């Protein structure tokens, strides 16, 4: 029986183009990449797209500080982000940018459809304005004293000390973060999207299982009051796309950012004629669409985005997978403590597969924060990857190469043991499918323990010294390497580079779930090369020291 290939489109949230990618960002990109690689290993068609989130006041200001045009800053960050994501073996079909002709075209199309439907209205609002820099100030560019707890130097919308949220007008002694001037209130006409028109659609969509239960329950709290209209415009000066037929008005970055997913696929379809844009985005599409996002941007992805798509006549996501934050050694990442670790800094010192494995060993389908504890990281890599997984191959390979010219035996001495490893396939694939990577890793490592126990019990090193036991040594090591082959297939979504090295060593076809069941018998393998190095504490310690 053959099952039909699934047609899947996966996105990860777009990294913002005003700073480097850090290990917190990598949680999401690694989580999504593992899932994509798993789907491909199962034989499904899975496209994986992302891109640079390139618009907004913050990018305009950062570019000014660096003496660059915003376009140059975006191009520079795009190159750096693509380098770092590639360094962590994140394999996007397209890593594009929201500052693109495709995104402009789609943003204008969606806005026009929203407007034609009567979902856009204009309203005059009062905003904080910097009289020196002559710019309207986003909340994050206003600093002052918290009106609740009195903490100084807090943002215009939230206090990082007590957690209170408020409007910039409530802030005590507010100043512009750009000039130090006291902001004034200034009126401006803005455009709003009537989100409340989509209340029933959103309730129904949220109840239909497209979100993790924790996320769905949290979102339902927003419906205790009427959904407020969403301000989708910003005033010049601003870096973004101008709103058609509205002088000096720009689309708010959060309007065109998720449209960037569509633009990235549209751009890919120009590179690859086999990719059909409409097949993935048209209303009623039978393909699957998954967004991987952090818990801080759920509101945009699970309320605004589905409502916009519905209004504009596009399909809605199959699911939105939400993850928590990363802490380092139990605390929020901090530059002063040396725990703000950029992706590039990590890659200067350690293998990306160590972190891919560690994150996988911690990730679940829950919206939980995960902690990168550096002592635990060292212990987990050395105990699991080196001590259990790689050790199994190194214990068997030498005997096969030296004593038997690289030739495996023509049958397995313990076919039942091999079969028992195969019987865990469904459990492991279910865990991968449901994002319960930590449970998958636990099962895989318990199999690695069993495989090593088998080698411990059979003692090929002792058998090799006995007379007339050559065939038994070959058989035991053939069994061990075939168990190692199964483990490698199970770990391949997490450890793609190591899996490729193993395929070269085993001299076999690319490992996947279709050829999982077939053992390598009467087959020649290549000389074994070390697959991974033990992680030294002093090497890991370099992560927290620039």
Curated annotation (Swiss-Prot):
It catalyses: tRNA(Met) + L-methionine + ATP = L-methionyl-tRNA(Met) + AMP + diphosphate. Its EC number is 6.1.1.10. Zn(2+) binds at residues 146, 149, 159, 162. Keywords: Aminoacyl-tRNA synthetase, ATP-binding, Cytoplasm, Ligase, Metal-binding, Nucleotide-binding, Protein biosynthesis, Zinc. Its cofactor is Zn(2+). GO terms for biological process: methionyl-tRNA aminoacylation. A motif ('KMSKS' region) lies at residues 332-336. InterPro entries: aa-tRNA-synth_I_CS, Anticodon_Met, Met-tRNA_ligase_1, Met-tRNA_synth, Methionyl/Leucyl_tRNA_Synth, MetRS_core, MetRS_Zn, Rossmann-like_a/b/a_fold. Pfam families: Anticodon_3 (PF19303), tRNA-synt_1g (PF09334). Belongs to the class-I aminoacyl-tRNA synthetase family. MetG type 1 subfamily. This is Methionine--tRNA ligase.
């Amino acid at each position: 029986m053959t099952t039909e290939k699934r047609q899947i489109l996966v996105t990860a949230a777009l990294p913002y183009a005003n700073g480097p990618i850090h290990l917190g960002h990598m949680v999401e990109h690694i989580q999504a990449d593992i899932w994509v690689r798993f789907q491909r290993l199962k034989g499904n068609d899975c496209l994986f797209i992302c891109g640079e989130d390139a618009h907004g006041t913050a990018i305009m200001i950062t570019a000014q500080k660096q003496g660059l045009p915003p376009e140059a800053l975006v191009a520079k960050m795009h190159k750096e982000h693509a380098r770092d994501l590639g360094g962590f073996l994140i394999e996007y079909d397209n890593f594009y940018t929201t500052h693109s002709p495709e995104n402009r075209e789609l943003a204008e199309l969606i806005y026009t459809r929203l407007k034609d439907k009567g979902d856009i209205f204009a309203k005059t609002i009062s905003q904080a304005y910097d009289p020196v820099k002559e710019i309207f100030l986003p909340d994050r560019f206003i600093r002052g004293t918290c009106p609740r707890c009195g903490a100084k130097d807090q943002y215009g919308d939230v206090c990082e000390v007590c957690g209170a949220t408020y409007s910039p007008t409530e802030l005590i002694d507010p100043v512009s973060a750009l000039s130090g001037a006291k902001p004034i209130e200034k009126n401006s006409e803005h455009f709003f999207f009537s989100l409340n028109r989509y209340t029933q659609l959103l309730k129904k969509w949220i109840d239909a299982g497209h979100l993790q239960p924790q996320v769905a329950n949290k979102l339902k709290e927003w419906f205790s009051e009427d959904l407020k209209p969403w301000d989708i415009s910003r005033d010049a000066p601003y870096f973004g796309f101008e709103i058609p037929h509205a002088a000096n008005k720009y689309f708010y970055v959060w309007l065109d950012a998720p449209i960037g997913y569509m633009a990235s696929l549209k751009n890919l379809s120009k590179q690859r004629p086999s990719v059909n844009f409409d097949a993935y985005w048209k209303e009623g599409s039978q393909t699957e669409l998954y967004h991987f996002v952090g818990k801080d941007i759920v509101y945009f992805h699970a309320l605004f985005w589905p409502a916009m798509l519905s209004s504009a006549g596009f399909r809605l996501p199959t699911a939105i997978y939400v993850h928590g934050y990363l802490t380092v050694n139990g605390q929020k990442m901090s530059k002063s403590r040396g725990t703000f670790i950029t992706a590039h800094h990590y890659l200067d010192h350690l293998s990306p597969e160590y972190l891919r494995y560690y994150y996988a060993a911690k990730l679940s389908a829950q919206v939980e924060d995960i902690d990168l504890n550096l002592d635990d990281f060292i212990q987990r890599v050395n105990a699991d990857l080196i001590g259990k997984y790689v050790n199994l191959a190194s214990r068997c390979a030498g005997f096969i190469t030296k004593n038997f010219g690289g030739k495996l035996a023509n049958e397995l001495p313990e076919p039942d043991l091999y079969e028992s490893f195969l019987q865990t396939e469904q459990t492991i694939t279910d865990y991968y499918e449901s994002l319960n990577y930590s449970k998958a890793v636990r099962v895989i490592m318990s199999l690695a323990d069993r495989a090593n126990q088998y080698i411990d019990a059979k003692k090929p090193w002792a058998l090799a010294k006995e007379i007339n036991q050559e065939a038994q040594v070959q058989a035991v090591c053939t069994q061990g390497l075939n168990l190692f082959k199964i483990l490698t297939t199970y770990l391949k979504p997490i450890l793609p580079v190591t899996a490729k090295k193993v395929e070269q060593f085993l001299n076999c076809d690319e490992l996947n779930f279709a050829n999982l069941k077939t053992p390598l018998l009467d087959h020649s393998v290549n000389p074994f090369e070390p697959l991974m190095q033990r992680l030294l504490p002093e090497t890991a310690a370099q992560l927290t020291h620039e």
